[in-house]
């Protein structure tokens, strides 16, 4: 069984993660992309308008990009073809239906907890300390939790397979977690609002505490891109693109694929609606009191939030749906959030198949 879990072009390389002959791999490939221009000669290749076009294969991604940039604004010289070369690579290297298996992928849910000395944590000014990080493997159900204190499980988390790593301070917590991440690097990371809170705050705080550039280690290719994304009412928030790791925020999946409008999208409300269960109550007036006065329950609160997202996936299969759509279109998992990218990939797939007939 051979399938990709991630593919994109970067410079002159195609960066790829996947499974080959049942084993996981990570690699960088040279690739010769193809673009098309109008032709006066008969050709099996056609534009979307039915015009004859001829292929130009380039020696590298950079050469193709330079050609495109040189002629893109020239009148009467249209350039055809997919300029996102990762899609070209996928279509060429994985012809026919992609046979994939989610059980061979590393799919994790994540939840973090921080201090709240100065209100809600701010990704752009990550001054609140990391207290707890939990990851759950969707396939094995193994839970790995890192916390700055000792922890003894109670009946609140009875039956869960928990590996708790007690850390003496935040520096140790982030160091140990990052080492663990590198050894178990996800193909897909999900959580509730994880793309706009858990992941960006984790990376921002890692860089502040462990040192400049250390957050790049979350990428198997050591490539991380910080960017601003539009949120509600035109507000901008900071997010991080982790090259090689797909972020499928379960809140975003739920909003996109359930086709219902909920009166609230808080995790507690969705958990009660979909699973008939709730988050663990703190029993304190403030979050600060919670982690200061009942550390054990605080850790369980974090673990249960992580498990709820995993249980939502077990019931609703929205991550699996996103994977199915991505493999049908032969694009990356994250691309399913963009109708344009998904349809671009479908169009490339359709025209490639038509040219081969």
Predicted segments with their positions:
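Active-site-proximal helix-loop-helix substrate-binding element of RNase H-like nuclease domains
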Residues: 142-148, 152-164, 168, 185, ...
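Long, highly charged low-complexity segments
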Residues: 45-108, 112-117
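Short catalytic/ligand-binding loop motif for oxyanion handling, primarily in non-cytosolic enzymes
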Residues: 118, 196-201
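Conserved RNase H-like, two-metal-ion catalytic cores of nucleic-acid enzymes
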Residues: 2-44, 93-188
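Short secondary-structure boundary/capping segments
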Residues: 123-127, 200-213, 326-330, 342
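A short, hydrophobic C-terminal helix/tail in secreted or cell-surface proteins
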Residues: 353-357
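Common nucleic-acid-contacting/processivity interface regions adjacent to the catalytic cores
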Residues: 285-352
């Amino acid at each position: 069984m051979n399938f990709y879990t991630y593919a994109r072009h970067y410079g002159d390389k195609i960066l790829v993660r996947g499974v080959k002959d049942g084993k996981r791999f990570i690699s960088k490939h040279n690739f010769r992309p193809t673009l098309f221009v109008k032709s006066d000669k008969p050709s099996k290749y056609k534009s979307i308008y039915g015009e004859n076009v001829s292929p130009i294969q380039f020696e590298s991604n950079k050469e193709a990009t330079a050609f495109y940039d040189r002629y893109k604004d020239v009148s009467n010289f249209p350039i055809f073809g997919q300029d996102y070369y990762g899609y070209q690579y996928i279509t060429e290297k994985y012809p026919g239906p992609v046979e994939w298996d989610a059980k061979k992928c590393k799919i994790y849910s994540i939840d973090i907890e921080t201090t709240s000395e100065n209100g809600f944590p701010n990704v752009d000014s990550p001054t609140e300390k990391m207290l707890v990080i939990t990851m759950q493997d969707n396939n094995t159900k193994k839970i790995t939790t890192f916390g700055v204190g000792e922890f003894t499980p109670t009946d609140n988390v009875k039956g869960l397979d928990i590996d708790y790593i007690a850390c003496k301070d935040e520096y140790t917590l982030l160091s140990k977690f990052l080492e663990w991440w590198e050894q178990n690097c996800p193909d897909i990371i999900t959580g509730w609002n994880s793309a706009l809170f858990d992941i960006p705050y984790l990376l921002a705080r890692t860089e502040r505490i462990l040192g400049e550039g250390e957050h790049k280690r979350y990428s198997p290719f050591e490539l991380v891109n910080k960017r601003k994304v539009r949120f509600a009412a035109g507000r901008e928030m900071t997010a991080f693109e982790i090259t090689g790791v797909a972020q499928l925020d379960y809140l975003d999946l739920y909003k996109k694929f359930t086709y219902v409008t909920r009166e609230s999208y808080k995790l507690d409300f969705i958990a009660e609606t979909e699973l008939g269960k709730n988050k663990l109550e703190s029993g304190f007036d403030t979050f600060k009191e919670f982690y200061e006065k009942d550390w054990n329950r605080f850790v369980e609160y974090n673990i249960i939030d992580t498990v709820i997202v995993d249980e939502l996936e077990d019931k609703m299969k929205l991550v699996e749906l996103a994977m199915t759509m991505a493999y049908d279109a032969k694009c990356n998992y994250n691309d399913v959030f963009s109708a344009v990218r998904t349809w671009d990939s479908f169009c490339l797939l359709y025209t490639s198949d038509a040219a081969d007939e």
